[in-house]
């Protein structure tokens, strides 16, 4: 599959926006610099042809990995996982990041058996907190998790954090890879390229790192 064509499709869909954005990071580090970009992969669900190509790309990363179930990280990862599960004719489950207080109070939606292996799918990885939370819920229910698959790695420590937790993260694109494609195709200016590249360089303030999105 032509990854450059997929990258161009993502740009055309508006998933990468430029400006000055407050992120989840600013809740704990209010003095952190504003992000010069924002990646909104939730938009992909509105473009069926693009979603088809994106999920095929993610399926390619899953070839050779061993798993019995596909688990999403709600809610951003849900459409990707649902379509991939349908394409592969594999069962899908969903860990509940918010504890259900009614009905069965299940921590995981869907049918599964303790001892089965689940592969976790999400849209992107930054600092990995939501991935680690989802994995812990699955493990607490007796499932095995060894691999995480995402569309974009923002290259802000998430892959390393998952590795430290014993998880292999497979990304279709690194952010720097997308930026190089967009720069070569003149979809972004040299100034935008430099602004994002500078932002991704780790910095520290009193309360911790300033780049990225938890």
Residue ranges of model-derived segments:
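PRPP-associated nucleotide enzymes
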Residues: 1-121, 125, 129-214
């Amino acid at each position: 599959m032509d990854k450059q064509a997929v990258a161009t499709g993502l740009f055309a869909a508006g998933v990468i926006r430029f400006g000055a954005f407050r992120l989840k990071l600013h809740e704990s580090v209010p003095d952190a610099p504003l992000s010069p970009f924002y990646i909104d992969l939730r938009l992909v669900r509105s473009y069926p042809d693009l979603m088809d190509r994106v999920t095929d790309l993610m399926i390619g990363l899953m070839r050779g990995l061993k798993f019995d179930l596909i688990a999403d990280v709600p809610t951003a990862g849900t459409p990707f996982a649902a379509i991939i599960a349908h394409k592969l004719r594999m069962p899908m489950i969903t860990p509940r990041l918010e504890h259900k207080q009614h009905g069965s109070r299940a921590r995981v939606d869907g049918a599964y058996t303790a001892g089965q292996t689940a592969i976790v799918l999400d849209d992107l990885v930054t600092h990995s907190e939501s991935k680690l939370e989802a994995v812990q819920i699955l493990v607490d229910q007796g499932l095995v998790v060894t691999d995480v698959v995402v569309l974009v790695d923002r290259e802000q420590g998430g892959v390393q954090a998952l590795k430290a937790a014993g998880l292999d993260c497979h990304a279709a694109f690194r952010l720097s890879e997308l930026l190089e494609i967009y720069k070569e195709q003149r979809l972004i200016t040299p100034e935008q390229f430099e602004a994002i590249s500078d932002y991704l360089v780790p910095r520290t303030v009193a309360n911790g790192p300033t780049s990225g999105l938890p």
